[in-house]
């Protein structure tokens, strides 16, 4: 463990449950790296991800974005390709992009959008894009004919959330430079979406634990009962 991390850890009471504002203030204070660290939210949910009816997945536009310049790749043809280019997509194409990704192991983009008619083509990339979380999905709004709106939302700060195998959701909610107030608003937007996404099949306590941390910093626990206060 680095010296900075140990110093930062002393600022956080490991047994305390903080309000979102208190926890985020600590996350900002403990971000000691020389770069503008990302502030991340970690939520352990009371679901069993092995069951299809207990999956938690979706997307939400953060009011202040993520602070990251997001590169969008769009699979579309004809008019929809023109729409995507006009809306500010970084890369637009069809079969030639599939070949480039397969042949060159090319991943110079953050989000992939596809029109529904292109999913047969994109499906060939399942094994490549799937493990990286880049496969377009209707639940997150990345399989759509409304490519212009999808690109606009992604560029404005839309983030995808998805429960992993250990029932945890990890998601960026901004940068250290945002300051506590903007981070709290982003935090609440994401928590609101997570609460609304609770599967009907989930039993017992849904929000098991909530914490925030800077990329290189220690975690501060948030009281699950106060996440939307």
From Swiss-Prot:
GO terms for molecular function: rRNA binding; structural constituent of ribosome; tRNA binding. PROSITE patterns: RIBOSOMAL_L1. One of its GO terms (biological process) is regulation of translation. One of its GO terms (cellular component) is large ribosomal subunit. InterPro entries: Ribosom_uL1_bac-type, Ribosomal_uL1, Ribosomal_uL1-like, Ribosomal_uL1/biogenesis, Ribosomal_uL1_3-a/b-sand, Ribosomal_uL1_CS. Keywords: Repressor, Ribonucleoprotein, Ribosomal protein, RNA-binding, rRNA-binding, Translation regulation, tRNA-binding. It holds the Pfam family Ribosomal_L1. Belongs to the universal ribosomal protein uL1 family. Binds directly to 23S rRNA. The L1 stalk is quite mobile in the ribosome, and is involved in E site tRNA release. Part of the 50S ribosomal subunit. This is Large ribosomal subunit protein uL1. It comes from Clostridium perfringens (strain 13 / Type A). The gene is rplA.
